[in-house]
């Protein structure tokens, strides 16, 4: 069972609609999270809260204006997650120029922003102070080796986020 106050999020990359529906029926996640080439219609078809991930710096999303224009179509999303661009899908462990988010943040339809991409205990404070995201997402930045998380690195990461967030 999932503990109280924890949301279940189902992450998909270019899923078959039947697979998404099966997860909705069998798991009942609070949120769907789309990381592929899903259109706004693909994301909204389930009538369920969703997060949309964007790969900042991808072809066609390499300027602040282009990124904001693309994001605008996903105005129904519960939040927008920004990761760095890599040729494949999934986290690359690399950061991106956070200046690309300037137009996104200023857009009237902007959604809660989740920052991802190359975040570590050493750089997350500067990223939080610069971007002021609603949340941060980390994976490889707290690993001691691929797939192995360090409880110390996680603690340092969380402490850095709290310290940066307190400096409003």
Which sequence ranges carry the predicted segments?
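Acidic, divalent-metal-coordinating active-site segment for phosphoryl/phosphodiester hydrolysis
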Residues: 120-124
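Residue-level signal for alpha-helix termini/capping positions
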Residues: 25, 106, 129-132, 162
């Amino acid at each position: 069972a999932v503990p109280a106050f924890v949301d279940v999020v189902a992450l998909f990359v270019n899923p078959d609609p039947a697979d998404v529906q099966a997860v909705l029926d069998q798991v009942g996640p609070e949120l769907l999270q789309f990381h592929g080439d899903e259109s706004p219609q693909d994301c909204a078809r389930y009538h369920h809260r969703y997060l949309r991930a964007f790969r900042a710096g991808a072809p066609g999303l390499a300027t602040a204006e282009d990124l904001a224009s693309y994001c605008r179509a996903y105005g129904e999303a519960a939040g927008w997650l920004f990761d760095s661009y890599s040729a494949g899908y999934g986290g690359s462990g690399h950061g991106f120029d956070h200046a690309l988010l300037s137009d996104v943040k200023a857009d009237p339809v902007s959604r809660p922003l989740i920052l991802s991409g190359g975040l570590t205990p050493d750089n997350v404070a500067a990223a939080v102070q610069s971007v002021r995201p609603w949340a941060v997402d980390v994976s490889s930045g707290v690993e001691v080796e691929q797939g192995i998380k360090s409880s110390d690195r996680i603690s340092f990461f969380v402490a850095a986020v709290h310290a940066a967030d307190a400096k409003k």
